[in-house]
Each structure stands twice: as C-alpha cells, then as structure tokens.
Amino acid sequence: MGKAAYHLPVMVREVVAWLVRRAGIYVDGTLGGGGHSLAILRALRDKGLEKGSFLIGIDQDSFAIAEAERTLASFRERTRLVQGNFREIADIVSTLRENQLRGMEVAGILLDLGVSSFQIDTSERGFSYLRSGPLDMRMEPDEGQSAADIVNTFEERELADIFFRFGEEKKSRRIASAICSWRNERGVIRGTQDLAAIVRSVVSVPDQQIKSLSRIFQALRIAVNDELGALESALKEGAASLSPQGRMAVMSYHSIEDRMVKHYFRTLAADDWGPKGVALREPLHKAAFTLVTRKALIAGDDEVNENSRARSAKMRVIERKMYSGEVSESDS
C-alpha cells in the first residue's frame, strides 16, 4: 500500500471552543488519524478537566484505528478506540458506561463527516479520480459491495438515480448511459481511470469535468458506504446519548450532508405545538435541545489558506437542555 498520511484536522480551534466545556465522556465518532481527539484531550488537560474525563474514538477503518493509537499514545489511559460505524454510537457508549465508565456523563460528541485525505491518497482504496486504482471505495475494505460492483452491475436508471441523489450531478442520466454503453462495448469497468474516462467523454469542458468527476465519485462513495443512512442514525443516536448540557458538533463538507444536519438539529430544537390549525397556549412538548449555533460555523481565512480541505467545512452545534428529554422515533 502506498505511503499516505492523515489530513490536518479541520477547525480544531472551533471544535475545542464550542465542544470542550466540562469533564465527562467525549466521543469522536469519526476518529480518522486522531487529530481532533488529540486536541480535545489536550484541551481537557489544559483546563484541569482530565481526571474526570474519557475519550471514546470510533472508526470503521482499521487503518485509522492503528494510526490513532499512535497519535493518542500519551493519553492511552483515558481513551478507548473502537472499530465500528458511528451509526452504532449509542450502543458503543452505553456498553462502556455500563462497565468501564459507570456514572460518567456524555459531555460532547464530534462527527467530522466525509472521507479522509489518507483514504483519498491511498490509490488502492479507489476514492479519487486523481489516482489510478481499483474502484473500491469501501470504508472497511473487506465488507459490502464495492464501487466496481455498482458501476458494473446496476441498471442505467439505478446509476442515474445514485448520481443525481448523492452527487447532485445534472448530467447523471447521460453519464449513466455512457457507463452502460462502455459495459456493452468494452466489458468490465476495471478502475478509477476507466470511470474517469467515461465521465470526461460526457463532460467536455475542463472546469466542468473536475466538478462532475468529484460529484460522481462522491455519489458512489456515499452509495457504497450508505453514508446518509449512517449519518441519520448517528445524529439520532448521538443526540439520545448526550447528557444534560452535553453538546454535539457535526462538521459536513457538502450540501447534502449539511442540509440533513441542519434539518435534524432544527427539529430537535423545536417545541411540539401539535397539528396545524389547533391553537394552543403552550406546546405539547418542549424541545429537549437548543441550537448553540444558529448558522453554520466556517473556517477562518488563515486556516483555509493553510488547509484547502477546510474551505467547504461547515460545523453546527446542538446542546441538550438541563431537564431530561427523550429522542423519540418521531424526532427522526
């Protein structure tokens, strides 16, 4: 496997400032190389909160777990790294709270969405059109169907739907048609460069090619890993896991994810006034959460200049109120 490195963590100062406020359990649901987790642990130490705190790191990529173990070695006694999907966050946290972390409250949860630079830069993973490699795109390489399975077996209508829904690609139908034509005329689509060539054959303008390639690869990655389904579950389970005054921060990198986060957070923070047209003096149920950030936070110019990945990042933060409130099925 080619040598690659994990990206600089995005918006670290904002994560620490808006998330780390008191002692307790902190959950990094998208561990990656451990950059955000390291910043959280250092902030807890510097604020004198280390003794009553613990960090749980979750990632489904075994390579990420191994890298994070090295990054967080100096905090080994106060960390637990779990290989799993962040959609399982509630089960992972509750299991640890019943045993090792009994009596501790969940003070903060961080979700940094999207694919890491390490995965993009590792050609064997097939995440990038800029590198020649197999069309894999699985976050955990040994599980589930790959991108190659999708582009070589799905019907034209199914491919177009994936490209439009998950990539918002305007030429989704034409690209899907070109993929099927390639399969009929030339056989199996074998790697990232075959797929890139197909997209370029449909989109002739160079600037538009780059955008369409990004959208198509994004759409396939989302489909392969059921990223939106996982995000929906993670938002619900994360919110349900928070203790009173606990906060959840979510960082997204494209509009589809950000809309999901924005909508769900607003739903959690809204009082239930019952059916429309029924006048009530008080809500049927008061919201158990409050929006900490009314608008998405973005990276500063200095960070964007140093780290291009920060350019598209948006962070939203929500907090559970002091009184107890359950997240019901209707909240999702």
From Swiss-Prot:
Q: One GO cellular component from the entry?
A: cytoplasm
- SUPFAM superfamilies from the UniProt entry: Putative methyltransferase TM0872, insert domain, S-adenosyl-L-methionine-dependent methyltransferases
GO BP, sorted A to Z: rRNA base methylation
**Where does it live in the cell?**
Cytoplasm
Q: What is its main location?
A: cytoplasm
Q: Tell me, what's a Pfam family for it?
A: Methyltransf_5
Q: What is its EC number?
A: 2.1.1.199
Task: Give the main EC class.
Answer: transferase
Q: What does this protein do?
A: Specifically methylates the N4 position of cytidine in position 1402 (C1402) of 16S rRNA.
Which protein is depicted? Ribosomal RNA small subunit methyltransferase H
